[in-house]
Swiss-Prot record:
It comes from Desulforudis audaxviator (strain MP104C). PROSITE patterns: G_TR_1, G_TR_2. Residues 8-282 form the tr-type G domain. GO terms for molecular function: GTP binding; GTPase activity; translation elongation factor activity. Transmembrane segments: none annotated. This is Elongation factor G. The lineage of its organism: Bacteria, Bacillati, Bacillota, Clostridia, Thermoanaerobacterales. Catalyzes the GTP-dependent ribosomal translocation step during translation elongation. During this step, the ribosome changes from the pre-translocational (PRE) to the post-translocational (POST) state as the newly formed A-site-bound peptidyl-tRNA and P-site-bound deacylated tRNA move to the P and E sites, respectively. Catalyzes the coordinated movement of the two tRNA molecules, the mRNA and conformational changes in the ribosome. GO terms for biological process: ribosome disassembly.
Amino acid sequence: MARVFPLERTRNIGIMAHIDAGKTTTTERILFYTGRVHRIGEVDDGAATMDWMVQEQERGITITSAATTCYWRDYRINIIDTPGHVDFTVEVERSLRVLDGAIAVFDAVAGVEPQSETVWRQADKYRVPRIVYLNKMDRVGADFFKSMQSIKTKLGSDPVAVQIPLGAEDRFVGMIDLVTRKAFIYTDDLGTKIKEIPIPADLTGVVAEYREKLLEMVAETDEELMIKYLNGEELTVEDIKIGIRKATLAVKKFPVLCGSSYRNKGVQPLLDAVVDYLPAPTDVPAVCGIDQRTGREDRRVARDDEPFSALAFKVMVDPYVGKLTFFRVYSGTVNSGSHVYNSTKQKKERIGRLLQMHANHREEIEAAHAGDIIGAVGLKFTSTGDTLSDEEHPIILEAMEFPEPVISIAIEPKTKGDQDKMGVALQRLAEEDPTFKIQSNEETGQTLISGMGELHLEIIVDRLLREFKVQANIGRPQVAYKETIKGIAQAEGRFIRQTGGRGQYGHVVIVVEPLDRGKGFAFSNQIVGGVVPKEFIPAVETGVREALTSGVLFGYPVADVKVSLVDGSYHPVDSSEVAFKIAASMAVKKAVANASPVLLEPIMRVEVVLPEDYVGDVISDLNSRRGHITQMEHQGKTQIVRADVPLAEMFGYATELRSRTQGRGNHTMQFDHYAEVPQNIADKMIRKY
């Protein structure tokens, strides 16, 4: 089936921000003005189109990345609305991996907030061009210029104003477009009637100053424009737009617009900016991968006549269609009902149906082309991060990396009937979410589920009950500790069994040594002269890995360790993979015990926003929680306190903060790093254990 929309007229964008900056409201307005919905849904009354999960509607937050398609000025815009809560950072990460551009929404009162920093860095990692939208210009304390400054200082980025606001707070009525030098105001509540007015006299100086900065930036993007500018010639609107687009696509500058989505002001110019300044799939570099046949790097260009390649970025279980896989087509075309090759798993898959998504509504289509973001039913083996390709031209695109979970809870089914259902349900939820992990404790028979934060696990448990009808008892949250070593040790593992007939023989000598924090695990084979035959080396590594899943102090996973196999011996008849695996496991346990093992705990980056009257009390409380204050900042009568605090000390903090600040303080926290548990705390834990 032929392509309906040319690639140059396609935009794949994300909407990203801190929680409560107004992303979902902005998306709702975009859907309204592009004619995708005929009434505006509000987040606060649970009617937002893009927040379609029950949990999202109840909490007024976005949890999953909902995808939708809309049209503006004969352009097709595929939008992914991403969550702002730190527990769902993985949703942002996997969306940014498949997008070409993004709208970064900031609260014009608060400026850059902690999660906006995280999301901005994620977008930097994938070099995603962005336009900035300063939302909530109608709120008390909204400050366009101060917010721009905070983008510059906190993010180290270069924002460039393409609009400035007409008024602020309750006097915010419209904008001045610096590209066209025109002022306009909104004359109706729905924001559909826009009237041009003369630029107010008191703003002519500000307009001249910021337009000059814009023209200077535009001139720097192109030699011809620079000559024109230096000769004092007028740059046309077209010249200016070309310059802004060039700087945006190069991820050097970030055009800044403003508005109030809730008051229906500023969304149409934002859509114009998406079309004018953000990239089409043809503007971004070819996607890189590894050719499976040759092992060499290969590239795929966004063209329909290239071999098919796509990246699965999300898997979800839909109550009506079953397993639904979202993927981005990077090159080529795929038809409904056709076979594709999962190059990551090296398996053939059949696409049952292709679906164009609109939040949770779907429209069946016959084919997907390069640049499309699409849902597919029928892919049995594909999981998040897998590459789909043409079997004749297999390629593996760079997969996504996800953070390790930091918090766990024990979960038990209430009845025997719930037991089987719970296993299936947890497995399905783990398929959807790469940061959600399940572990069974053989000794206690308990199931441990782990995630990125309390809210993350709360949502999982809620979904178990509502979607899968599983009744379960939930334990108290537990911290995902790890163990590591501080010293170097050598140990020997010898496994010999003789029970008549063929025996078992495995013998290894290994050395363990610490790695830098966050480096994980490394295995090094230093065998010379075949004292341990090559065919047994993988079994040794497997034994080592299995032994490190349970440390010698408390049974927590051992991290940041290098294990080297340095010596050993074998028996020509009795040696086997099993014997070497067991010998390696025995050696590692001994070596770790002799290498000064220590306990590691997750440290969270905490930001508390509160009135200055309560600062002393809150700081002393954070100190009592083993917190380390890293920064304090003043914003009017508000103080921002930043600290690194162990997760173990943060349970119940929200309630404590509310009572200490009479409900006027709030906090956000996100995982930062692992650090050694102080000896006195570790000793207490050992006595309890």
